[in-house]
Amino acid sequence: MELGQEATDDKRYVLVGRISGLYGVQGWLRVYSYTQPRNNILDYEPWYLQQNGAWQARRLRKGRVQGKGIVVALEGIDERDVAALWVGCEIAVHRDQLPPPQEGEYYWSDLIGLQVITLQGEVLGQVDRLLETGANDVLVVRGERERLLPFLMGMIVKQVDLQQGLLTVDWDPDF
């Protein structure tokens, strides 16, 4: 999973998933959920879907876990051809709907855009996006070049300062 490039700059919203495909012929959609557990995405409304750079609010008519994913029917999307236009769209919800992150936890959307510096104060770049790899999340940092840094609190990531917009890492800048 990738998160970041299409994320809204409006910090009032948090990306929680994306439309990943079609399901059936009546306009149902497959959803890849970024929430843990994955079915938590069904608890939030309205969804804000990004299509062609614009965000549109949509309400859930129905939704359920289906296999390893989620399938949903959204208001105003009743046909497969119409549903196909939404495949690939990001899903965001208003931040007020989500619980605040616990100590030492962060929403990915809060990390995107932070300046990344080493313990020695050398600037590596900015967090462009994050990747979910299974073993651990990975920060994609863009500066003079792109770097992939494991998001391991304490080992690699030493400090996250959202107020200052800084993420301090124990990382060799030549790596």
UniProtKB/Swiss-Prot annotation:
GO biological process entries: ribosomal small subunit biogenesis; rRNA processing
GO MF: ribosome binding
Disulfide bond positions: none
Primary location: cytoplasm
Subcellular location: Cytoplasm
Pfam families: PRC_RimM, RimM
Keywords linked to the UniProt accession: Chaperone, Cytoplasm, Ribosome biogenesis, rRNA processing
Residue ranges occupied by any PRC barrel domain in the UniProt entry: 103-175
Keyword Chaperone in annotation: yes
Record-level GO cellular component terms: cytoplasm; ribosome
NCBIfam families for this protein: 16S_RimM (TIGR02273)
Domain remarks in the Swiss-Prot or TrEMBL record: The PRC barrel domain binds ribosomal protein uS19.
Family: Belongs to the RimM family.
Subunit structure: Binds ribosomal protein uS19.
Protein task: An accessory protein needed during the final step in the assembly of 30S ribosomal subunit, possibly for assembly of the head region. Essential for efficient processing of 16S rRNA. May be needed both before and after RbfA during the maturation of 16S rRNA. It has affinity for free ribosomal 30S subunits but not for 70S ribosomes.
Protein name: Ribosome maturation factor RimM
